[in-house]
Amino acid sequence: MHIPDNYLSPSTCATLFVAMTPIWYYSIRKINKTLSADKIPLIGIGGAFAFILMMFNLPIPDGTTAHAVGGTLIALLLGPYAACIAISVALFIQAIIFGDGGILSFGANCFNIAFILPFTGFFIYKILNKIHLSPFYHKC
């Protein structure tokens, strides 16, 4: 669920935007070093996938909605840094064109949806994979 404008104070929104700035910078640098040029378009596909998933809202009690993001899936396929950039771009387009979330709360939404979600899912998967509890692990 996107955080709407005027839900958080402007100082909180500004703090989270400033917190996201080095994360975006480091993510772009990491992508340039680790992903080959032929995989860069996959980031756009991942962003489009996240964009589509976030457009399907499901009503939940108390008059709000929830939606899938696909951040962990993108992180598992392309890495958490690529997922961070892909989801941030999708959130920006949604904030500008559709008004989902908001311009002021863009940094807060990116922090929650584009940073915490893919990195947490990615590292939980890695930990479960190491101790052989991954749903994708099977003995040969």
Segment roles from a protein language model:
Residues 6-10, 14, 31-40, 80, ...:
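Hydrophobic, aromatic-rich alpha-helical transmembrane segments
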Residues 2-15, 20-73:
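Hydrophobic transmembrane alpha-helices
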Residues 46, 82-84, 121:
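Structural motif
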Residues 18-23, 86, 116, 120-121, ...:
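Alpha-helical transmembrane segments and their lipid-water interface positions
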